[in-house]
UniProtKB/Swiss-Prot annotation:
Keywords, comma-separated and alphabetical: Cell inner membrane, Cell membrane, Hydrolase, Lipid A biosynthesis, Lipid biosynthesis, Lipid metabolism, Manganese, Membrane, Metal-binding
GO biological process, one term: lipid A biosynthetic process
InterPro entries: Calcineurin-like_PHP_ApaH, LpxH-like, Metallo-depent_PP-like, UDP-diacylglucosamine_Hdrlase
UniProt pathway: Glycolipid biosynthesis; lipid IV(A) biosynthesis; lipid IV(A) from (3R)-3-hydroxytetradecanoyl-[acyl-carrier-protein] and UDP-N-acetyl-alpha-D-glucosamine: step 4/6
E.C. number(s) listed in UniProt: 3.6.1.54
GO cellular component: cytoplasm; extrinsic component of plasma membrane
UniProt protein name: UDP-2,3-diacylglucosamine hydrolase
Alphabetical list of Pfam families matching this protein: Metallophos (PF00149)
GO molecular function, one term: UDP-2,3-diacylglucosamine hydrolase activity
Note on how the cofactor is bound: Binds 2 Mn(2+) ions per subunit in a binuclear metal center.
Membrane protein topology class: Peripheral membrane protein
Binding site for Mn(2+) 2: 41, 79, 114, 195
Originating organism: Salmonella schwarzengrund (strain CVM19633)
Encoding gene per record: lpxH
Names of the cofactor(s): Mn(2+)
Length: 240
């Protein structure tokens, strides 16, 4: 019995080793799981379910194969792929979740999220996030021709990269008070998230009890997953 969590794969055709590693993961490790949760940024960018990128179809088929084998797959949007919609969910068999979700895992309540909403010290990013998550802005963007959406997405990624290069690492990490507030709001002692690309298990206090924040790593030179069993919560790095 085990439930698996991954995040921040940033899949793109320019990184075939990561794509191949994910396909192996779906065919091997994930097949033994009770469920797989993808906590955002599965793709490097997503400009709409109507994008004919062959990689998207390949990943949908692979995930659907996992689901058809009896392993449900759940997805929380990240800051790169927040426009993944019902069409891709239907094609892949994934179940879309809200940005925050509490799971009962073998008697242990665990809060899961992508993690970008925890980085409240980065006021610039949070303001940008509020704009792009505005439903009417998203609807307007999705009505644009694909070639225009690609240009906008490329400019946004370039702008984000330039902005992050001038920010301190602390600003781009989670805010400790925000973490505790979220855990106490949901009354949990465990939090699993991605986004920061800083894999670690942090001990803290929430609800006047010991608590733990488990951060998934990004898939760059190695894969990263959290494995929850009835007896343990493990952060595991593995070769791609």
């Amino acid at each position: 019995m085990a439930t698996l969590f991954i995040a921040d794969l940033h899949l793109q055709t320019e990184e075939p080793a990561i794509v191949a590693g994910f396909l192996r993961f779906l065919a091997v490790e994930a097949r033994q799981a009770d469920a797989l949760y993808i906590l955002g940024d599965l793709f490097e960018a997503w400009i709409g379910d109507d994008d004919p990128n062959p990689l998207h179809r390949e990943m949908a088929v692979a995930i659907k194969s996992l689901v058809d084998s009896g392993v449900p797959c759940f997805f929380i949007h990240g800051n790169r792929d927040f426009l993944i919609g019902k069409r891709f969910a239907r094609e892949s068999g994934m179940i879309l979740l809200p940005q925050e979700k509490v799971l009962d895992l073998y008697g242990r309540n665990v809060l899961i999220m992508h993690g970008d909403t925890l980085c409240t010290d980065d006021a610039g990013y949070q303001a940008f996030r509020a704009k792009v998550h505005n439903p009417w802005i998203q609807r307007l963007f999705l009505t644009l021709p694909l070639f225009i959406r690609r240009r906008i997405a490329a400019r946004m990624r370039a702008g984000s990269k330039a902005a992050n290069s001038s920010k301190s690492l602390d600003i781009m990490d989670v805010n400790a008070q925000t973490v505790v507030a979220e855990m106490e709001k949901h009354r949990v002692q465990w939090l699993v998230h991605g986004h920061t690309h800083r894999p670690a298990v942090h001990e803290l206090s929430a609800n006047d009890q010991p608590a733990f924040r488990v951060v998934l790593g990004a898939w760059h030179h190695e894969g990263s997953m959290v494995k929850v069993t009835p007896d343990n919560v493990e952060l595991i790095a593995f070769p791609l």
